[in-house]
Each structure stands twice: as structure tokens, then as C-alpha cells.
Amino acid sequence: MNDLTLPSVSVILPILNEERDLSNCISAILQQEYSGNIEIILALGPSKDRTTEIATELAKFDSRIKLVSNPSGQTAAGLNLAIAKSSYEVICRIDGHSEISRSYIKTAVEIMSKQGAVNIGGLMYADSE
């Protein structure tokens, strides 16, 4: 697969009370070693901290970040709302407190392409709390 054939990817995140980790999570997504298009869709639940303000600020400075309201705060509802707002066929689900490696999306897309898979998953390891 060369850069000209890389599919565009919608990264979706159901978000609730992620004030501490959200900026680092989004930064890791934006620094991906992936030359295809990437958009980030944050499904914002009714957070009791500064999550919504942080997300709004991040979206102001990068047009690839889109916000959608998730009034219930439920993960499944947030995922569905984010998928409905997504522009691309390939969906990558990330948790708002995660920091993915720089090759995460590239590796996932390569595996999907090579295996003809429509869904892949993997283990996540905690570096801290």
C-alpha cells in the first residue's frame, strides 16, 4: 500500500471527564506517522470537569477536530453519534485517556488491508495510572 492509496480515517472518541489526559491523547493522534487524511470526532458527554472547554479549544486550532454532543454520556451512544458524524469509511476508536504510539493508525490500516479484515483490535498497556 503506498501513500496514494491510503484510506482516510475517522478517529472517534467518547469523552467524559478526561480533563487530565485529553490534550495528550489528541496530540498523540495528531502526530501519527500516517499520510492519509485523519479527522478526530469527540463525542462530548456531560463532564463535571474542564473536558468540554479543553475540547473546544483544541477544535478551534485544528479543523480536523470535530465535536458532537453526547447528552447521556454513555459510551455506546457517544460512539454511535461520532460514527454518524464521521466522514470516512475507516473508523478508529480511541479512549480519551489513551496515548497511542505514532504508528498506531498506520499499523492498523496496514493489517486491515493485508488481511482483508473489516475490524481489528489489540491490547493496550498502561504506562501510568
What are these regions (language model features)?
Residues 27-37:
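Short, acidic, metal-binding catalytic loop of nucleotide-sugar glycosyltransferases
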Residues 91:
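Short aromatic/hydrophobic "clamp" motif used to bind/position activated sugar donors
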Residues 7-10, 39:
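Cell-envelope/extracellular polymer assembly enzymes that use nucleotide-activated donors
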Residues 70-86, 107:
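Glycine-rich, basic loop-to-helix element that forms the pyrophosphate-binding segment
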Residues 44-53, 98:
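A conserved acidic beta->alpha catalytic loop
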Residues 103-129:
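Conserved donor NDP-sugar-binding/catalytic core segment of glycosyltransferases
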Residues 23, 49-58, 103:
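Acidic helix N-cap motif at the loop->helix transition within catalytic regions
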Residues 37-47, 66-71:
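Short beta-strand/loop segment that forms part of the nucleotide-sugar
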